[in-house]
Amino acid sequence: MSSQKKVSSGNTTPSGLAGLASPLNDQQINLLQQISDLSPQQLAWVSGYFWGLSQSAAPSAVTPIAQAVSAVAAKPAGKLTIIFASQTGNAKGVAEALEQEAKAEGIAVQLFDASDYKGKNLANETHVIIVASTNGEGEAPDNAIELHEFLQSKKAPKLPNLQYGVIGLGDSSYEFFCQTGKDFDSYLAKLGATPFIERVDCDVDYDASAAQWRKQALEKVKDALSAGVEADVVQLPVAQLAAGHALYTKQKPYAATLLTSQKITGRDSGKDVRHVEIDLAGSGITYQPGDALGVWFENSGELANQVLAKVGLSGVESVDVDGESLSIHSALVSKFEITSSNPQQVEKFAQLSGSKKLLKLVEEKDKLREYAGNTQLVDLLAEKQTKLTAEELVGLLRRLTPRLYSIASSQTEVDEEVHLTVGLVEYDVKGEKRFGGASGYLAQRLEEGEQVKVFVENNNNFKLPADDNVPVIMVGPGTGIAPFRSFIQERDNRGAEGKNWLFFGDRTFTQDFLYQVEWQKYLKSGLLTKLDVAFSRDQAEKVYVQQRILENAAQVWQWIQEGAYLYVCGDANRMAKDVHQAFVAVAEQEGKMSRDDAEEFINDLRKAKRYQRDVY
């Protein structure tokens, strides 16, 4: 091809525009030619900036080209790349907050979902921050599996020029606390990258520690990336920044109204499962099938009194919470977690109380985790009667965090409502009833017509296929059925032609078949192509959903060969693992593969987002 510049309408166009009729005047052409020596990353930035301007109707006194060219010319070449590995949205939220804070500091920044980031590009980066949650037993979140594996492989590039930071999110009650964050830290270091800030491992109540780490990280990054002449950051039009941004968030929830909390298990069931409907009218809140609803709850006032009695407090003592003076009773009800315990809490109370039993337990980490996972605060305090001040009690406690529930409705069906399937956590301790915090709030204490603070947590790792002709296989025992009610409503209202197969399981057919009438209706209409159930206590030998999958191995494999998407929702500890092994066994048996090849095949489905899980 000829490199000769083409003259059109009296304008000399840059070589990249050769052959195109230019709508630009001479001054604009001259300005545009100034970008010819920009780096690829700067060109990408300018491209995105121009696109944003093209979508905005707002006029500007400054020509877009002049504004963009002067801004990029003044900015240093370096940028901060933020990558989030997120399962439920917490890591994504921290990453988005970091992005906004970086912009406010004038730092060039770009944000990536781990599933959209090519690991080989790390070789071209100068500064990267990874925000990583941990899934299951130390596993990477679904959106980060590929990047996690790539960094361990021989294909991973050497990274001598990369400086990085890692923030891990997790739950210290679990053995593999923040394991994914630790993994990324280790992998990057082995590839020759240098940490510019020490990794932080954040617990369940991560807001304060994450905010402090972000501030420190940006102070270090700003020094490194602002060596050139500083210029004002050129923002995309506000409409572009706000696109897709939630009106209400974890920090600013919406005060919705409880419409109903109806028990949907039988009178003789050993479980209390509620169908909960919440009114969102006028909020403008939207959600998609697969998303979760965050619920801020209040603890039981009666339970707060029991806790206070254990440590010799009346409840009127004052404590300072975020600069606000509250009675200790009010603080326990609305600000702190009192329906569970954790290893750090047990260890602290062991020191305060001098309990020999607890001090011995602290030395045995496995037993400590098991104890903390099965013991509420009030029962921990009962181990040894110990008087505490209000400040000492608060020092034992984690901050209250919202609970996430898989949404059980589609807005194409219920409009300005959101539905949940809530299993009441309920058990006995020495003859006394214990209840879960959020489930007890929704099922027992919150009255119809009262307000409940909520927000939508998007889950891009659990979404219906865009193609309505693709078959889907859904595995959701117990309350894991919730998102599949949403899926079926959505496919019904979209007129989707793809086949739908549901595997459901619980204890008994007569008492625990959640939404039975709805599933029978969908089965009769043909929308639900196939329904297989496993009720574990309806026969002498217990039967579970994974066995139903194996019994239908040939047909499951046929659907997979037809491009079916696989979805699993529910218990992560046993069910999800057993179902995963069932899918591997199907691939091994029907696909005539070795066990290792079958495992790789199923994991490849996960990477391709054809095998998605919402487990807890």
From Swiss-Prot:
Catalyzed chemical reaction(s): hydrogen sulfide + 3 NADP(+) + 3 H2O = sulfite + 3 NADPH + 4 H(+)
Q: Which UniProt keywords apply?
A: Amino-acid biosynthesis, Cysteine biosynthesis, Electron transport, FAD, Flavoprotein, FMN, NADP, Oxidoreductase, Transport
Q: In which pathway does it act?
A: Sulfur metabolism; hydrogen sulfide biosynthesis; hydrogen sulfide from sulfite (NADPH route): step 1/1
Keyword field contains Coiled coil: no
> What's the EC number here?
1.8.1.2
Which positions in this protein are listed as binding FMN? 86-91, 133-136, 169-178
Residues holding NADP(+): 536-537, 542-546, 578
Which residues take part in binding FAD?
339, 373, 403-406, 421-423, 427, 436-439, 616
Q: Would you name any one GO CC term? A: cytosol
Q: What is the stated purpose of this protein?
A: Component of the sulfite reductase complex that catalyzes the 6-electron reduction of sulfite to sulfide. This is one of several activities required for the biosynthesis of L-cysteine from sulfate. The flavoprotein component catalyzes the electron flow from NADPH -> FAD -> FMN to the hemoprotein component.
Q: Which family does it belong to?
A: Belongs to the NADPH-dependent sulphite reductase flavoprotein subunit CysJ family. In the N-terminal section; belongs to the flavodoxin family.
User: Subunit structure, briefly?
Assistant: Alpha(8)-beta(8). The alpha component is a flavoprotein, the beta component is a hemoprotein.
Name of the protein = Sulfite reductase [NADPH] flavoprotein alpha-component
Biological source species: Vibrio vulnificus (strain CMCP6)
Identify the gene encoding this protein.
Answer: cysJ
